[in-house]
């Protein structure tokens, strides 16, 4: 009887822990930034004069390269927007990899977000590119990678094919909940 009870609890706890392990942690973009990374920035925000201060800009760039060690290796779900790096125009705009960014329209033509606010997505299989303003969710294991010089500076990476289109209402709801 005791042996059966022990086996029951062992299996029960294994199943519970295994189900938690498979569940993706929904991550907000601010969690990609470690605490105190930008503690030198005044609460009132950055002024135009601060952009002329080379030491301040150097600190700002250095802070953008800091990553949150607590979330590396975790199975996550992250909402954002696709910025394709290369597309095969002969194959209905197929992509093999892209950058996931927190806001629509962030691309090469505007100043990019800091490296700790971009996630390199490497696809297991090519997929069709999404429209620039189409919110998506990406699921996978978050890794830390060194930035690639002279291209983009993402310091996070996910290899996956779990890309899901999200409707605007769902994206707005997630954004509003993340601000609470």
Where are these regions (language model features)?
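Bacterial N-terminal signal peptides
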Residues: 7-16
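OB-fold and OB-like single-stranded nucleic-acid-recognition modules
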Residues: 21-180
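Positively charged n-region of N-terminal signal peptides that target proteins for export
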Residues: 1-4
């Amino acid at each position: 009887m005791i042996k059966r009870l022990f086996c029951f609890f062992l299996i029960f706890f294994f199943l519970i822990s295994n189900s938690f392990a498979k569940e993706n942690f929904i991550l907000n973009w601010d969690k990609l930034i470690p605490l105190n990374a930008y503690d030198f920035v005044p609460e009132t925000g950055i002024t135009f004069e601060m952009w002329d201060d080379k030491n301040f800009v150097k600190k700002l760039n250095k802070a953008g390269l800091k990553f949150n060690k607590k979330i590396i290796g975790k199975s996550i779900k992250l909402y954002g927007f696709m910025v394709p790096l290369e597309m095969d125009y002969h194959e209905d705009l197929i992509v093999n990899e892209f950058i996931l960014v927190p806001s629509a329209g962030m691309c090469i033509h505007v100043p990019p977000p800091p490296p700790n606010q971009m996630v390199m997505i490497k696809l297991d299989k090519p997929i069709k590119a999404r429209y620039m303003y189409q919110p998506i969710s990406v699921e996978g294991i978050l890794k830390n990678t060194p930035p690639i010089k002279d291209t983009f500076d993402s310091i996070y990476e996910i290899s996956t094919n779990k890309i899901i289109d999200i409707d605007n209402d769902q994206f707005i709801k997630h954004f509003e909940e993340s601000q609470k």
